[in-house]
């Protein structure tokens, strides 16, 4: 699949490459879309001649960096968008949905997969679990914020507290499962790649709304043409295939 996607991206970039010289393009994005972007950057660089300097972090942390005025040619943020557009740091008209990503449940490889088909089934699974791990929402992790809201909606947030092992990032949560330190793990589906775990599935939409990720062009982009090339690439039909491969839904 990777070869196919890369070929499509190379063709798209060859058609859409700008006439300007090579430039460095800076990008900032949350961890939920990190792996998809990292997968695509080499093909963009080869085909466009530009280079990309990418910064990744928590959903809240990266958004705050943009809001405070740090300049990244292509910022990728999660809603609400009004907080970002009100700062004047981004071109409001450039707002484009790139992808959405859902919170998923994972277990250690070879372990039974619990039923998560309904809200009641998820509640039963969580109450029966001895330990769970997921990214720390208090530190800005969007997956953690989302799952905290799910537990509150289910009415079990306080009851679950003694069982929770909060970590920094989805990869750490998956590693804890693979090592047998916790029974269940949750993070964005796009972050589950550890060979020691297996995906059970995504949480039902009735208790967990997928997180949307929007791209912008910064008002102070160092090379507007190069920024536009990367921005258009990340929202292209070819890139949509990469998002799907990584467990995300394309924004358009």
Question: Which positions does each model-derived feature cover?
Answer:
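Positively charged n-region of N-terminal signal peptides that target proteins for export
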Residues: 1-5
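Bacterial N-terminal signal peptides
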Residues: 6-16
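Bacterial Sec-dependent signal peptides at the C-terminal "C-region" and cleavage site
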Residues: 15-23
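Exported/periplasmic ABC-transporter solute-binding proteins
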Residues: 22-70, 77-88, 94-101, 107-252
């Amino acid at each position: 699949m990777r070869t196919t996607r890369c070929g499509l991206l190379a063709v798209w970039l060859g058609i859409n490459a700008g006439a300007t010289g090579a430039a460095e393009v800076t990008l900032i994005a949350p961890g939920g879309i990190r792996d998809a972007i990292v997968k695509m950057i080499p093909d963009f660089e080869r085909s466009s001649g530009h280079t990309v300097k990418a910064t990744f972090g928590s959903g809240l942390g990266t958004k705050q960096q943009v809001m405070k005025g740090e300049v990244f040619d292509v910022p990728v943020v999660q809603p609400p968008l009004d907080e970002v557009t009100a700062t004047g740091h981004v071109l409001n008209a450039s707002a484009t949905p790139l992808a959405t990503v859902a919170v998923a449940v994972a277990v250690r490889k070879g372990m039974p997969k619990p039923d998560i088909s309904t809200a009641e089934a998820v509640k039963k699974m969580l109450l029966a679990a001895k330990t769970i791990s997921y990214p720390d929402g208090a530190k800005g992790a969007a997956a953690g914020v989302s799952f905290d809201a799910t537990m509150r909606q289910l009415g079990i947030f306080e009851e679950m507290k003694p069982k929770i092992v909060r970590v920094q990032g989805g990869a750490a949560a998956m590693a804890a499962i693979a090592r047998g330190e916790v029974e269940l793990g949750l993070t964005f589906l796009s972050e589950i790649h550890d060979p020691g775990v297996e995906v059970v599935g995504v949480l039902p939409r009735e208790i967990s709304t997928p997180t949307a990720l929007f791209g912008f062009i910064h008002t102070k982009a160092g090379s507007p043409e190069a920024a536009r090339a990367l921005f258009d690439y990340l929202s292209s039909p070819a890139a949509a295939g990469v998002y799907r491969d990584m467990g995300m839904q394309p924004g358009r």
